[in-house]
């Protein structure tokens, strides 16, 4: 087996070895074509051809594009092997921004409120990536003025959460996760920040003329503010 983690990239692999002996301890040779190494879950798992590397010793590689534990059992067309099995652990590869995404909630926030950003970090094979040290998300757009973002909280399942405190400016807000100064999602998440409810204390009404005779008209102006 490799000395370190084996990445689920379809390239790095474990080497499984089966030593076959008879009841007297003698090597059982010539069985390569009748042996099988079978994964319990074949999704994303590739088992190489079995070869006899020395008398009675059989070997094959196992790779995967699926992170997590892979249980492999050994079978023989000729002999009863019992429950010979091995558990192999594959880990996610490096972050792939093209396979990662970010969402914002709520989708129509109000100025002065908060927005929750959820970043889903994945590798090139859509495995969740957890061991990262991302920077705080970047903010852009009109509503970014006066807005601030917290750092990310690792949820432990490949998702990360950050809180954005909005400023007093309405308009579009774009949020992008960053890792080592680079974009960490395929696209930025966008929302439109809207003005707060109309405030009677801040809004004003003005009339062009103080005194208007019956039947005449005047202009009334409402300056609406939140």
Regions found by a protein language model. Give the residues of each.
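Assembly/interface hotspot detector across virion components, adhesins/toxins, and nucleic-acid enzymes
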Residues: 50, 104, 152-154
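A broad, low-specificity signal marking well-ordered, structured residues that form hydrophobic/aromatic
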Residues: 35, 58, 86, 137, ...
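Aromatic sugar-binding surface patches on proteins
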Residues: 53-60, 155-163
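Short S/T/G/P-enriched beta-strand
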Residues: 1-29, 41-42, 55, 66-130, ...
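Short amphipathic beta-strand segments in non-cytosolic proteins
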Residues: 34-49, 135-150
């Amino acid at each position: 087996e490799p000395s370190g983690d084996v990445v689920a990239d379809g390239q790095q692999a474990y080497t499984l070895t089966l030593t076959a002996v008879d009841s007297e301890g003698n090597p059982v040779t010539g069985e390569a074509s009748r042996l099988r190494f079978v994964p319990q879950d074949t999704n994303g798992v590739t088992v190489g051809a079995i070869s006899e590397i020395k008398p009675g010793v059989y070997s094959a590689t196992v790779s995967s594009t699926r992170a997590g534990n892979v249980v492999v059992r050994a079978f023989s067309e000729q002999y009863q092997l019992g429950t010979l099995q091995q558990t192999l652990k594959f880990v996610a590869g490096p972050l792939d921004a093209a396979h990662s995404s970010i969402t914002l909630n709520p989708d129509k926030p109000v100025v002065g409120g908060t927005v929750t950003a959820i970043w889903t970090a994945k590798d090139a094979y859509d495995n969740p990536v957890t061991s990262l040290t991302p920077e705080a998300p970047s903010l852009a757009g009109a509503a970014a003025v006066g807005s601030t973002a917290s750092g990310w909280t690792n949820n432990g399942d490949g998702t990360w959460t950050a809180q954005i405190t909005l400023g007093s400016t309405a308009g579009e807000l774009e949020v992008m996760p960053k890792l080592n100064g680079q974009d960490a999602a395929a696209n930025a998440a966008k929302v439109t920040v809207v003005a707060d409810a109309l405030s009677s204390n801040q809004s004003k009404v003005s009339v062009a003329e103080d005194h208007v005779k019956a039947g005449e008209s005047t202009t009334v102006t409402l300056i609406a503010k939140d």
